[in-house]
């Protein structure tokens, strides 16, 4: 909207200023109106070493980490599909941009449906289904010949990638209830899961950059997409092992519902 009224540079500056003013205003509202309870530090040690060791020894901790890492790698990398569509399939810049923005419309749908599905069949089963959809969708993107007439296959596959990756992301910590984590250990477990699982955000761009520099054009993108697909397969395997290890706990949770 701003770029239609003024030149592109001024439009971008206006957008930045508007976002900055909104954030400053929200910060001031929180500062003046949010009343936080007085913080009282627990006399216990900040890091409980025995609890930390207990969490580290649990296989579920590392399975959950793998599930987070393998699904979040896709969340950090899907935007490479847009330049792939424009460069290989000859899609216009408008179609490429629309394909990118399309993810934000699919996000609430994927999260909404996955939430309801998790209540019916369990969070880890939703993750497993999401990984399957993710893998099939990526294979569709990789195997589709670079012809503009076949761009619709890429768009459909993109919808599958978007829906599955956001569905899986919404279950990252929901599956913790299926493991044998006592309540007092969930915080410690999260302290391990978060930095390791979300380290995909630092690693995925490095791998993408290496692939695109080593193999130019279509081949570079396809090599990277194949790596992402393999990572998703690893996530699915970790998910299936999780399902096997948490079977009794999941049955107990389902009985309570």
What are these regions (language model features)?
Residues 3-20, 210-232:
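A membrane-interface helix-boundary motif in multi-pass transporters
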Residues 180-216:
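A late C-terminal transmembrane helix in Major Facilitator Superfamily
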Residues 243-257:
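Intrinsic disorder in cytosolic terminal tails and internal cytosolic loops
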Residues 59-111, 169, 204-205:
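Extracytoplasmic gate region of multi-pass secondary transporters
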Residues 123-175:
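C-terminal transmembrane helical hairpin of 12-TM major facilitator-type secondary transporters
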Residues 111-123, 212:
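Helix-to-loop junctions at the C-terminal end of transmembrane segments
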Residues 20-40, 238-243:
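C-terminal membrane-cytosol helix-exit motif in multi-pass small-molecule transporters
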Residues 36-64:
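Juxtamembrane intracellular "pre-TM" segments in multi-pass secondary transporters
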């Amino acid at each position: 909207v701003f770029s239609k009224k003024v030149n592109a540079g001024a439009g971008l500056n206006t957008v930045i200023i508007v976002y900055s003013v909104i954030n400053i205003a929200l910060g001031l509202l929180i500062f003046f109106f949010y009343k936080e309870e007085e913080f009282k530090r627990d006399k216990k040690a900040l890091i409980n070493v025995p609890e930390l060791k207990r969490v580290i020894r649990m296989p579920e901790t590392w399975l959950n980490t793998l599930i987070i890492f393998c699904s979040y790698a896709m969340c950090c990398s899907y935007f490479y599909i847009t330049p792939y569509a424009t460069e290989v399939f000859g899609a216009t810049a408008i179609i490429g941009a629309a394909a990118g923005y399309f993810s934000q419309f699919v996000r609430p749908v994927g999260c909404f449906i996955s939430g309801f599905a998790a209540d019916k069949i369990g969070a880890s089963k939703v993750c497993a289904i999401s990984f399957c959809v993710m893998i099939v969708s990526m294979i569709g993107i990789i195997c589709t010949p670079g012809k503009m007439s076949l761009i619709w296959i890429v768009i459909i596959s993109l919808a599958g990638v978007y829906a599955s990756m956001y569905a899986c992301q919404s279950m990252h910590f929901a599956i913790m209830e299926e493991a044998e984590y006592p309540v007092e250990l969930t915080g410690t477990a999260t302290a391990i899961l978060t930095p390791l699982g979300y380290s995909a955000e630092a690693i995925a761009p490095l791998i993408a950059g290496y692939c695109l520099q080593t193999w130019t054009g279509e081949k570079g993108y396809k090599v990277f997409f194949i790596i992402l697909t393999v990572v998703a397969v690893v996530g699915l395997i970790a998910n299936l092992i999780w399902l096997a290890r948490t079977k009794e706990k999941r049955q107990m949770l389902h009985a309570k519902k």
